[in-house]
Curated annotation (Swiss-Prot):
EC nos: 2.4.2.1, 2.4.2.2
One annotated GO molecular function: uridine phosphorylase activity
Gene name per UniProt: ppnP
Family: Belongs to the nucleoside phosphorylase PpnP family.
Reaction(s) catalysed (UniProt annotation): a purine D-ribonucleoside + phosphate = a purine nucleobase + alpha-D-ribose 1-phosphate; adenosine + phosphate = alpha-D-ribose 1-phosphate + adenine; cytidine + phosphate = cytosine + alpha-D-ribose 1-phosphate; guanosine + phosphate = alpha-D-ribose 1-phosphate + guanine
Keywords assigned: Glycosyltransferase, Transferase
Keyword Metal-binding: no
Function: Catalyzes the phosphorolysis of diverse nucleosides, yielding D-ribose 1-phosphate and the respective free bases. Can use uridine, adenosine, guanosine, cytidine, thymidine, inosine and xanthosine as substrates. Also catalyzes the reverse reactions.
Protein's UniProt name: Pyrimidine/purine nucleoside phosphorylase
Pfam short name (any one): Ppnp
GO CC entries: cytosol
Alphabetical list of HAMAP family matching this protein: Nucleos_phosphorylase_PpnP
Protein source organism: Burkholderia vietnamiensis (strain G4 / LMG 22486) (Burkholderia cepacia (strain R1808))
Length: 106
C-alpha cells in the first residue's frame, strides 16, 4: 500500500546516487510492478540535469525554480507541488531552500 507519506512493499538500493560533488543525493526505490522512483535531496545551488525517460518531480519540502529545455521562463515550486520533464531532455534547477523530492520515471 502507498500513502501520502510512505511507500510500502518496496526494495531500496543501498548505494546512494551522488551527483554534482554531493549537492544532489538520492536512493532508488524499486516497486513490485517494475517501476522505480528516486527519493533525494538537493542542497541550495544551481544545476543542469539531463533526462533519459520522462520524469515527474514531486517536491516534498523546500523551494526551487525550474527552467525546462526550450523555455525562457523560470517556474517556482514548493512543498506539495510537482513538475514534469520530457524524456531525452534537460532542465535547469535553482534550489532556493534544501529540496526534498520524489522523482518518478514515467
Amino acid at each position: 500500500m502507498t500513502s501520502a507519506t510512505q511507500f510500502d512493499n518496496v526494495s531500496v538500493v543501498k548505494r546512494a546516487n551522488v551527483y554534482f560533488d554531493g549537492k544532489c543525493v538520492s536512493h532508488t526505490v524499486l516497486f513490485p510492478d517494475g517501476t522505480r522512483k528516486t527519493l533525494g535531496v538537493i542542497l541550495p545551488c544551481a544545476l543542469n540535469f539531463g533526462t533519459d525517460a520522462p520524469e515527474l518531480m514531486e517536491v516534498q519540502a523546500g523551494k526551487c525554480r525550474v527552467k525546462l529545455a526550450g523555455s525562457s521562463e523560470w517556474q517556482t515550486y514548493g512543498a506539495g507541488e510537482s513538475f514534469s520533464v520530457p524524456g531525452n531532455s534537460r532542465f535547469d534547477i535553482e534550489v532556493l531552500d534544501t529540496l526534498d523530492y520524489v522523482c518518478s520515471y514515467l
